[in-house]
Amino acid sequence: MGALFGTDGVRGLANEELSPELAFKLGRAGAFVLQEETGARALVIGRDTRLSGDMLEAALVAGICSVGVDVIRVGVLPTPAIAYLSRAPEAGGGVVISASHNPYEDNGIKFFGANGYKLPDRLEDRIEHLVLTAGGALPTPSGIGVGRVREMPDAMERYVRFACGTGPSDLAGLKIVVDCANGAAYQVAPQVLGRLGASVVPLFDTPDGTNINAGCGSTHPHVLQQAVPAEGADLGLAFDGDADRLIAVDEHGRLVDGDHLLVICGRHMRRHGRLAGNTMVVTVMSNLGLHLALREAGIRVLQTKVGDRYVLEEMLRSGCCLGGEQSGHIIFTEYNTTGDGIITALQLLKVMRETGRPLSQLAAQMERLPQLLENVRVRDRNAVMSSPALWEAIARYEHGLNGEGRILVRPSGTEPLVRVMAEARNETLLTKVVEELVRVVTEIDRQQAG
């Protein structure tokens, strides 16, 4: 990570940390680098429903056109839809304006190459260098050399048709409650499921620019958990603001997180000979229960640090076709080049259709060990993480778990947070360990602030 780019592009408070001026510079530098690397003549631009999206899109479009690259605007669409459309013959890459699961005040910018993948560190570093040091040296064509802006009127329909082709052909008889998070999936997700024949009950599908992720979506599924049994539905699906992640709810209103989804899909694919190398990729945050359930099924697990980009890198390196995170970022490389909440939902529904089993039974394949996660807001997450006192405390409390649990303390890649996570069979001990480590982190942060 550099001064601008984090684990998922550039993010910050819109109009302050992520200003129109910075968006303009990112547009210029990003378009120049993609043009130089792949000969890109046009970039697809999409966004989520945040109020600041229009402002940042205008600045970004101006920057891209100012170096002679065309823009294809597609409006509000999920991040994975932009990844898919970036591979279209008329495109040479794409840009998404979104801050995913963050509150509406934040926004972000991330780039995709012509292959539909997020840019590697090497290219992000190059863009960052140009933004910070050499932006004025970039080309400034005039006359017919300036980039043009055009629309892609059938952008949503292209993605809907693509998504429908990846899942079960008929969902008739299934009732599904869909929490759209007032975000980028608010039109697409109900449309895909409805076209396949499901009875869809939409929730949080009226974005107003300020209500994205507000008490809804994959990070706040409590309303969905109540709605599924109340509606007599077969399951619920919750997306985040840009719909690159999915959390499900079974027919009884119980959460089915990313770890469960990986186990359900991975074991089914293994059983049908569709799991490449009988191997999956997960992160260090995955529950111990996932490892036990996959080991029982004869599935090998590769681990990475947190972040879907690292999961994808390992999948491509090792030839795996399924990987993901507990948070619901699930990647099926057979279908898309990034985490895709709608594709994940369709693969889950495919398992339900092919097995004839309700989601509660499928989720029971994994027993989740008690896990507790606390986010501690700090002034300097990297300074806290480098404190010897923190690592001494971690070692001390890890020893106290007697080999029946684990501790993971890590900085957030996108926010000023230190995440304290622990797992243990003894829930009382688990709570005590996390509370003590939160206290240690808070005290270290206070001391460092002077």
Curated annotation (Swiss-Prot):
The active site is at residue 100. Its EC number is 5.4.2.10. It catalyses: alpha-D-glucosamine 1-phosphate = D-glucosamine 6-phosphate. One of its GO terms (molecular function) is phosphoglucosamine mutase activity. Its cofactor is Mg(2+). Catalyzes the conversion of glucosamine-6-phosphate to glucosamine-1-phosphate. This is Phosphoglucosamine mutase. It comes from Desulforudis audaxviator (strain MP104C). The gene is glmM.
